[in-house]
């Protein structure tokens, strides 16, 4: 799980950045020191998330409830609209939306009738707000509705079966019964952490920071 070279001294023709890449450690992740700053990174297993392109209505409703959508009709409207966005027909579900709804928006557009290519695309779907998707921003108003967000628990990849070893507690609670969740967590606790996993998709989020500066940039 660790891909590193024995030498930390640049060979002929190598730059400091190239050596830093060679010292990449997927398990014991630390800042990568460069000449003019540092790079930090996080790695998430996409197989430990819920696929937005294959989730059924019950799973979507649980995701929305977790984020903070308390009203059942609102949850049903969003989940039906997500399913309508993906399916190939022009017929909307009971509380869903198709072209007849989106053509009335400003500016007007069409339902995709195809799979999501990015998670941000959810913002085009009827009822989905930035707060529901990303979570509420810090607010001084205690009475303002707060949302947890679901973006970190979603993937666009086709995941036949979620990997329970890398799924978050939130994803486990959404996909499994409480008894199963307790069993999974107990097994993980007793067997310890294993650095290798047989997953197909990973998402790496790097953040660069300029030395002696508060400037950061995340890709």
Language model segments and positions:
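Compositionally biased linear targeting/interaction segments
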Residues: 1-219
């Amino acid at each position: 799980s660790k891909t590193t070279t024995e030498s930390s001294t640049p060979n002929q023709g190598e730059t400091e950045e190239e050596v830093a890449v060679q010292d990449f450690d997927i398990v014991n992740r630390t800042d990568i020191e460069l000449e003019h700053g540092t790079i930090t990174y996080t790695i998430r297993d996409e197989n430990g998330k819920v696929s937005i392109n294959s989730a059924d209505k019950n799973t979507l409703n649980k995701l929305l409830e977790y984020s903070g959508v308390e009203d059942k009709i609102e949850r049903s409207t969003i989940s039906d609209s997500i399913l309508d966005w993906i399916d190939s027909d022009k017929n909307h579900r009971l509380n869903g939306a198709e072209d007849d709804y989106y053509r009335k928006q400003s500016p007007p557009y069409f339902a995709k009738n195809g799979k999501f290519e990015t998670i941000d695309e959810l913002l085009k779907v009827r009822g989905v707000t930035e707060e529901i998707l990303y979570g509420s921003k810090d607010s001084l108003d205690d009475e303002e509705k707060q949302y947890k967000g679901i973006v970190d628990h979603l993937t666009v990849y086709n995941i036949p079966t979620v990997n329970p070893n890398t799924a978050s507690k939130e994803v486990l609670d959404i996909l499994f019964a409480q008894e199963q969740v307790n069993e999974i967590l107990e097994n993980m606790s007793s067997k310890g952490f294993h650095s290798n996993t047989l997953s197909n998709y990973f998402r790496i989020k790097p953040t660069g920071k300029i030395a002696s500066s508060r400037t950061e940039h995340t890709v």
